[in-house]
Amino acid sequence: MPQGFLARVAGRTRQIFATVVSAGVGNAGNIVALDATGRLDESVLPVGIGADTTQAVASEALGAGKFVNYHDDGGVFSVRLADNSNGRHADGFVLEAVAEAATATVYPLDGTNAELTGLTIGARYWLGTAGSVTAMPLDETDAGNANKISQYLGVAKSATELVTDDDGYVVL
């Protein structure tokens, strides 16, 4: 429950609770409160202000924290797992699991992916297979890596957070 405060309403002292999620104009003038994650809900922000995200249909199931690739799926702007082995560079990442055919919220690179595990603080990471990351970049001189994607993704801030960088990619 959000914090409450005392206010004079129609000549009487009343306890009023801050608004966590706005229902729109009915909440005009309310004081806002942080949600359970310690952040403001997007519904209380002005139009045009909020997370820089893109909505796309998932053409396959996506796990939380996976890096994804935009593509055209039969004329539908869609998203699938990024993969260094089959030419699918990473365009962004998802923070929540998404079922196939559901709408995914994709966060662009240059943000923090906080849904990973097993990272080493300060280590650099590259795109792996099936939306994952790897601590070892592909060897450009290995003929077995021909036509694979070499894409630096960022540096680990913690065991679960990768500060991503939109550094581009190279097809080997």
Spans of features found by a protein language model:
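Glycine-anchored, exposed beta-strand/edge motif detector
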Residues: 2-10, 25-28, 47-172
